[in-house]
């Protein structure tokens, strides 16, 4: 089995065929999916999707693009939303200096709020970081000094220094279809160098379809293609990478129940 540790099933791209998307994912062996929150104010819509589909879980949080719109969201607000058994993570939160859709101060404030919630609940924080390696590492190191928290750098596109510092802090690193792109040799070098127990796979669907489906809408079933390239990059079999990334997922997203066949 495989898992898609990060997708956006509430996005309009899936509105007319969500049932079929879930069926295709399960047919491809994807038994667990985490659909990721981008706005706390839309949390109930996200939670409703998880309640429709067994094996689908969600996070709660504010994407850095929207940080300035949800500065009133408190640690207590986030923690309260995690009481549902279907809510298994915080985020995605972090820093996006590529688009800078929110002021950087708002992004950092939101990032630290989500870290505090992850620390309090023990649930993993899904971190979005783009073209913000130095500040991301700085904030993570400062906040870890206040107390450890579980987290994953999702859709990793950073440099080797951010990867090194994240691993040193105990974080995991997740790869999307970007890993499969021809111009991603440097990213594949990083993926090859990471400890086996810290790697995850995700689609970030509907975005970033892997090379085989480039230009098409992405969906959870396509995580298989990412796992294939990760396996090739690390010189192991697809079965081994599937087992490893799945074990890593359940260790990090510990609130997600394991299927009977995956229980250890």
Which residues make up each language-model segment?
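Mid-domain alpha/beta scaffold segments of enzyme catalytic cores
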Residues: 1-264
């Amino acid at each position: 089995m495989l898992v898609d540790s990060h997708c956006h099933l509430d996005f309009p791209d899936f509105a007319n065929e969500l049932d079929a998307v879930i069926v295709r994912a399960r047919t491809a062996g994807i038994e667990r999916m985490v659909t990721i929150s981008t706005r706390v104010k839309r949390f109930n819509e996200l939670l409703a999707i998880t309640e429709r589909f067994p094996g689908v879980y969600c996070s709660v949080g504010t994407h850095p693009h929207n940080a300035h719109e949800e500065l009133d969201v408190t640690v207590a607000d986030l923690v309260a939303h995690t009481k549902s058994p279907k809510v298994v993570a915080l985020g995605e939160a972090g820093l996006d200096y590529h688009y800078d859709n929110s002021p950087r101060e708002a992004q950092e404030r939101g990032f630290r709020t989500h870290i505090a919630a992850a620390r309090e609940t023990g649930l993993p924080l899904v971190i979005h970081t783009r073209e913000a390696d130095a500040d991301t590492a700085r904030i993570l190191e400062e906040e870890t000094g206040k107390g450890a928290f579980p987290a994953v750098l999702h859709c990793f596109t950073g440099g080797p220094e951010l990867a090194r510092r994240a691993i040193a802090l105990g974080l995991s690193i997740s790869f999307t279809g970007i890993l499969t792109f021809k111009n991603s040799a440097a990213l594949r070098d990083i993926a090859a160098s990471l400890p086996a127990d810290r790697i995850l796979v995700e689609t970030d669907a509907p975005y970033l379809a892997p090379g085989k489906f480039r230009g098409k809408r992405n969906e959870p079933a396509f995580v298989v293609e990412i796992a294939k390239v990760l396996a090739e990059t690390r010189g192991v079999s697809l079965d081994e990478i599937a087992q490893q990334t799945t074990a890593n997922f359940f260790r990090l997203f510990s609130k997600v129940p394991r299927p009977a066949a995956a229980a250890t």
